[in-house]
Each structure stands twice: as structure tokens, then as C-alpha cells.
Amino acid sequence: MGFSLTDYAPYDFANRRHIGPSPKEMGQMLATLGVPSLEALINEALPEGIRRRDPLAFGPALSERDTLHRMRELADKNTVLTSLIGQGYHGTHTPPVILRNILENPAWYTAYTPYQPEISQGRLEALLNFQTMMADLTGLPIANASLLDEGTAAAEAMAMAQRASKSKARGFFVAEDCHPQTIDVIRTRAEPLGIEVIVGAVDALDPEAVFAALFQYPGSYGHVRDYSDVIEALHGARALAVVAADPLALTLLKSPGEMGADIAIGSTQRFGVPMGYGGPHAAYMTCTDALKRSMPGRIIGVSVDARGNKAYRLSLQTREQHIRREKANSNVCTAQALLAVMASMYGVFHGPDGLKAIAQTVHRKTARMADGLTELGFKVDPQDYFDTITVKVGSMQGVILAAALREGVNLRKVGTDRIGITLDELTLGRTIEAVWRAFGAEGMVYDKTRMVYHLPQEMLRESSYMTHPIFHMNRAEAEMTRYMRRLADRDLALDRAMIPLGSCTMKLNATVEMLPLTWPEFANLHPFAPADQAAGYHEMIAELSQMLCDVTGYDAMSMQPNSGAQGEYAGLLAIRGYHRARGEGHRNICLIPTSAHGTNPASAQMVGWKVVVVKSAENGDIDLEDFRAKAEQHSENLAGCMITYPSTHGVFEEIVREVCDITHAHGGQVYIDGANMNAMVGLSAPGDLGGDVSHLNLHKTFCIPHGGGGPGMGPIGVKAHLAPHLPSHATATGAGFGDAGAVASAAYGSPSILTISYAYCLLMGGAGLTQATKVAILNANYMAKRLSAGFPILYANDKGRVAHECILDTRVLDKIAGVTVEDVAKRLMDCGFHAPTMSWPVAGTLMVEPTESEPKAELDRFCDAMLAIREEADAIAAGSLDAENNPLKRAPHTVEDLVGDWDRPYSREQACYPPGAFRVDKYWPPVNRVDNAYGDRNLVCTCPPVEDYAEPAE
């Protein structure tokens, strides 16, 4: 047999690694659909009028090896010095056991938000640990499971305080020693809501003039102050107190709760999460019990399952935007779950004694640094501090900063005559000596045996914290590794099975895309370091911005929004700024279809707009006549509309251009939600359809993993006329920045995870990205075809095609057998699947999105499982299965069910091994169905007492 060349391309990442179905499988799927080619299917699914004419101009795809080489080139252009800038960002040591077993572990980073608690018990416990740690440290009983960053958390606290305060004042006081970036984010949030931000000295605060006040603790310039008297005065005026507290400092200092604070916020970045040039990190929020229903973000609570065993779940969801829409507490959806898990594990790893020891070491080194500078003749402020000092240097500021740079150290420029210095757990004695040299010392040596303290005695913490046994476990690495493994094994993530959540795009997060994230050159840069030290970052961001402009048809891109919801908010601020610049600031009406994401109306409310709801037609499209009538009715005040494309019903609407034209004709701007961009990349572009602004969910379309509920990124693309109104930031100017104010603490949001999306674009190239979109549409239509044998497909176009997702009308099961959509979701767990999106956008249905990454075998396994569920419902309807005591109503089934007494009228085999379930590698849900009502009636959002963990006696 002669030697012949193969046409197999092993390094073709797009077609061999990212896209699931093989060419042979695609042929089989196309045959099932009755179309001769993939292009023929796309022609049937997409209206001709929305197709883009030019291919993506990305250049050829790179191999994994070449992509890593390019990432290394960029990394080498970053210069990582020792940053003692502080301002809320600190050097930290990520314990390798946490780095490897959490951040680099797909069992953790590929999971979805834990809406299905039975298959999310591991990360729910880790997030409950986070809440417990923060509640204990801050001395306040209620904690949420993270917010986006400290600045956003402060803005959310302001809005929360306004909702809850009994004061009629419109002012919000911000202490002048709060972090500057926090003040900027607060100003941006306050202005559209008509809140007056009063920045000033604490001693000048008039409690009667404000509904709440924010204090930094310790202050940005180092001051440690007891705010008890000020808070008491605020309460006397019926106003609330918010304290932005450093969690490491709270191991040594009196807690905000002990001072009487109503709300505490801050960042947990220094708990083992790298700075990443600004993010991502988990912010926290805690509050008094009286304010719990006003709190934004996710709250993990303790409930029970059907057997009465302890189980965790998301609590008080009626506060959230997917239910309350424009009346929601916040538009926050994605937060920072993965980073909160890392921070919680840092707390478990060190325990309270370890955290206190780290804090004492940091303070002792800071005190020694200060004493040395005092010996050199400099005036050091304040007298009492934790880790930050400010040095009066007069006209020597520039000389000293430059000298420190030569020593490899970044210091903070404060005003024109001061320098700020913040130490952290990584600060070495030789770094302190280098700073002394920069200040002119010769031969001064750091003596680590010299004990110096500068904490006020009356402020030292006496209350206990982190007393739960989980923070006192054996911290040998073997036990830590096993604990994290046990939690991971309780969860169902993409490393086990497809997660076909509609509108969530749970696609492959390739290992090669994730690798550069943890490289020191990307991970260890301070966001306020001199710009020339981040040249690699800036080059990458500029290239990625250009790629995304090509994808979307827009002219400019802002990378600052660090979630999809923040992207919506920033996009609407751009529209608002545009109207105001043209003297039309009165425009405040936003048209939003009934089928819109719940974040849309919540975001509109945040910029001070009024929401006018537009009906949907019977085929799922926007009701064009209703849209036209309402645009005409509100023509004088129309700010814009928010639509999703393809629609949230999973269909490419042919009327999209007409909707845009109507909006523009009445003076409005068009916001096209980018949640469904996975159906458009390379085939259509929102900017070409008439959109003025869109956000992209990089954690959906561009491969940033969901992390069990964050991180995410929501950059916005805009047409040229909106570019002057993009977000701004005090530390950055130029392309991608405008005049809208800051919407995140860091200029580029969470830039370290942009490495993932950038690598994805390099690996795929323009042709690969376009092929991925086509296969996403193929997979969805193949599943719709197979599943139509058991369930009506609720919406399709006139050719019977869907976009990248489809809605299964599972209400038919309720009609014939009393089987609810929740029963179906729980039964899918027995099959080893996470349920599709439940009851949205249509109550009682499932929205299925397989993405391009799933191979045919996994699609078929899911279809087999769903069709078997239909057969079980038919058996109930026929009377061969009991109406209540059946596999659907009792799902999910656990090992405890299997080994216990079996008194059910169906077999163990039928319960635990339905079609679709693996036999050898079966996933076992760790708990039975969770009682949601019990969890809300009996809210517990910190770790339950140790007795609850005890195994029941025989």
C-alpha cells in the first residue's frame, strides 16, 4: 500500500477542537433536516436582508502553539514592578492549591449560576462560606454572594440606601478619603437619578442634608477612625451609614457593625485574587437584617430538601431583575462567583488566625516603613493607620517617584506634594529598603525583629469572627484538596455534560484560552501603574476592540463594563449623553418588548428613564403596530428602544430594520442587546441593522467561562456619533473613552479575562468564528427537529427554522399529566443534564441552546432524555404511572433514595437510569428536590451550625 497524504488538519482549532460535530456528523444532521448543505440551512434560517456582505477581516486562524506565542509576545511587553500604590488593589499570594483546584479547574470555572440548586450544592456551599466570612468580618448579619467591584458595590449601596432610608433628603455624602475611583463610579450612578453627591470632610457632614453617607475604613490615605458618633448622628436624622471596609484590616480593627453601620461594602481582592490590571475580583456587601430585601445581587440561603436534609439555594429571588424588571433592586445579574469562591477558600486555607497573622505582619512592616521615613526627616500621616501612609515631600515628589521607579517600585502620587505608600502580604524587607533609598536613605537596613505598631488601642477588634468549624478545619494541603474536590463533585458543570441554557451560550472554554490568564505579566499588574508598564495589555485591548467592531458593525468599543448588565447601563448612558449634548435631555422614554431580558428595564430605570412596554405578536416577533403606535405617542420624549436580536424567542425577525427606522424617525436611538450574538457573528452585525449601540457578553459569545455566576465582561460597541459619550476614567484617555463617567473601578473593567476572548479570536480567525455561528444554528435546528416529535416548538420562521436556540412548549405535559416545567428540569438531573432555561421568555416552557461546541452524541443524549420524559408523562396520562408518586414528581433521585427503603410504584432502575444517563459515569445529585418556600420563610445566609453537618444517627 503506497504512502498518501492525509487532508486531516490536527492543528485546525476551530474545526477540530472548538466546533463539536465532525464533518460526517454534520452531514447526518443536515440529512435529518432535509437540507443539502450547511449554507442552505443558513439561507433558510436567516433573512437575506440582514446578512452581512463582507467576511470578517481577522486574517487566518492561529494554531494553539502560535496563539500562545502571540500571548507571550504581549505578556513580555508588560512590565511588572512592585506596586505599593494601594487604592483598593494589593499584591497577594494565591495559594497554589487554590490556583490549581479552583481557578484552573473546569469543574469550577465552567459551571453556570446556581439556579438549579440540586446540582449546584458544591459552589453554593463555597459561596455560603464567602457570605459567612464577610458577615463575620463586618459584624453585619446578612451578606450577598458578591458584586462586581468595590466602586460598583458603593454605587449599589447608595441606591439601596435611598430605597431604604426614611430620610427625605436627596443628598448622599461621600467622605473625601474614599478611593477616587469609587467616588467617580458613584457620581456616574447618582446623576441620572437626581441624587446630589456631597464629597467632603467627615467633620463637615450635615446628617439632615443626606439620606446616607459613605466612609472608607481605613481611609484611602491611611486614616483609621471610629465612625460610631457620626453614624449615631446619621441615624438621628433617619439616614443610613455605609462603610467601605478592607476585609484584611477587619481582622485587627473594630467592625463596621460594631460602629452601627447599616451597610458594609468592599473588595476581597487581597484574599488571594491577583490584581489582573483591575479585575476580575469579588466585591462584597453586608447589611442589617432590616435591609435584606433591599439588597442587590445573589444571596445564598440554607433550606431543606424533600427528605428534610440540609440544602443550599439562591434565596429571595423576587428581588431580582428577571422577576421584578424595572422595579428590581438592581440590574446586577452576573457577579463574581468564581472569585468569591477563591476568596472564601483563601479564608478556609488561612482561617481567622492565619488572616490575623497576615494582617499583623502587613501592619508591622508599614509601621517600620513609616518610622524609617520619619527618621529621614519626612512628615508621615496619619498617626494611626493599618497598611497605608501618606508622606509630605513638597517639591521632591517627582524626584522621589522617579527614584522609586528605578528601584522597581511604583508609589502613589497624591496631589502635588505627597506620596502614598501601601504595603501588602508580599512586601519584602528589601522592598522597604528600596523605598527608603528612593527617599534618600543610605545604608538603612530593615530589621524584621523590630516590633513597631501604630494602631489606636481603642480601635482594636475584640469580637470574634470566622468561628464556624469550616474555617478551623485541618489546613494540610491534602485535606484542602479533598475538600475542594468534594465540593466540585457535587456540581454539574460543562466538564461533565452539555448545559443547554437558552440565551446563556454555555460553549467550550478551551484550555489554551485560559492559560495566559494566570501568567504573572497579566495577573500581577496594578490597574493604576504607569501606562507604559501595561503596553502589552493596551496592544491586546486595541486589537480586540477592532475585532469586535468588525464583528458588530460599530465604530468604537469600550471595554470598561464588567458584566452584560453594566454594558446595558453604559450603553444607555451613551444614548442619554448624546441626547443631552444635542439639547434634548428631556427624552426619557424607552420602548422595551415584553420578551426582553429583565436587565433591560432595570438598566433603563438606572439612567432615569421610564419604560413603556411593547407587545409581542403571536409569532413571537415584536408587535410592529404596537411599537409604531407607542413610538408616535411618545415621539417628543422618545429616548430609544431596547431590543434583542435574534429575538429572545429564538428567531431572526425580518422586521428588525423597520423597528430601527421607526425609532430613528421619532428621534430615538436603538440599543440592540448582544445576548444572542452567538447566532450573528460573521453572518450579521447589529450596527448594520440600524443599531446605535450594543453590548457583547464576552462570557457567552467569546468564551470567557461563566464561573458559576461570574466573572463576565460586557463591552459596548457604538456608532461614531455615540463614541464621545462612552465611559470615562480618571486614569485613561483616548480611544474607547468618552464623557459618561466611570461605570467600573478600573479603566478596562476586568482586563485579565480579556486574554481569553482575544485568544479565542486568534484561534478561530474570521472564517472559524463564522463557521461556529453556522454550526450553532445547525445544532439548534437539529435538536428542534428531533424534539418536535415530543414537544411543540413554540416559535420558528416561515420556513420552520429557528436561530441558535428554540423554545420547547412543555406546557403540554402539564395539560395531559400535571407535569410542570420544574418536574422536567429536575428529571433531567437524573439523566445527567442541567435543564435548559426555565419559564423564560414564556412561562412553563424550556429554551434550549446547544451552542456549536457540542458533538452530535451529546445532542442525541439530551434529545433521548427529553423524549423519554415525554413518554413518562404519557404513561401518567394513561394511568400506568401514578399521578403523584412517579419518577418525574420525585426527581431528582439520590444515592440515599437508591439504598434506602423503596416504597415507590416504579423501579430503582427507572428512577436512577433513565435514557440519557450514563451507567458507569453517572452523575448523582447530592440532594433531593430543594424546598424553595422553606428557604425564603426561614432565611439563613451564613453557614449553619456544626450540628447540622452531623450525619443522622442510625
UniProtKB/Swiss-Prot annotation:
One of the record's GO cellular component terms: cytosol
Disulfide bonds: none
InterPro entries: GcvP, GDC-P_C, GDC-P_N, GDC_P, PyrdxlP-dep_Trfase, PyrdxlP-dep_Trfase_major, PyrdxlP-dep_Trfase_small
Any Pfam family the entry gives: GcvP2_C
GO BP field: glycine decarboxylation via glycine cleavage system
Record key words, sorted: Oxidoreductase, Pyridoxal phosphate
Catalytic activity of the protein: N(6)-[(R)-lipoyl]-L-lysyl-[glycine-cleavage complex H protein] + glycine + H(+) = N(6)-[(R)-S(8)-aminomethyldihydrolipoyl]-L-lysyl-[glycine-cleavage complex H protein] + CO2
Keyword Glycosyltransferase attached: no
Residues carrying N6-(pyridoxal phosphate)lysine: 700
SUPFAM superfamilies for this protein: PLP-dependent transferases (SSF53383)
Molecular function as annotated in GO: glycine binding; glycine dehydrogenase (decarboxylating) activity; pyridoxal phosphate binding
Enzyme Commission designation: 1.4.4.2
Summary of subunit composition and partner proteins: The glycine cleavage system is composed of four proteins: P, T, L and H.
PANTHER family (UniProt xref): GLYCINE DEHYDROGENASE (DECARBOXYLATING), MITOCHONDRIAL, GLYCINE DEHYDROGENASE, DECARBOXYLATING
Protein's job: The glycine cleavage system catalyzes the degradation of glycine. The P protein binds the alpha-amino group of glycine through its pyridoxal phosphate cofactor; CO(2) is released and the remaining methylamine moiety is then transferred to the lipoamide cofactor of the H protein.
Annotated family: Belongs to the GcvP family.
Record-given protein name: Glycine dehydrogenase (decarboxylating)
Organism: Dinoroseobacter shibae (strain DSM 16493 / NCIMB 14021 / DFL 12)
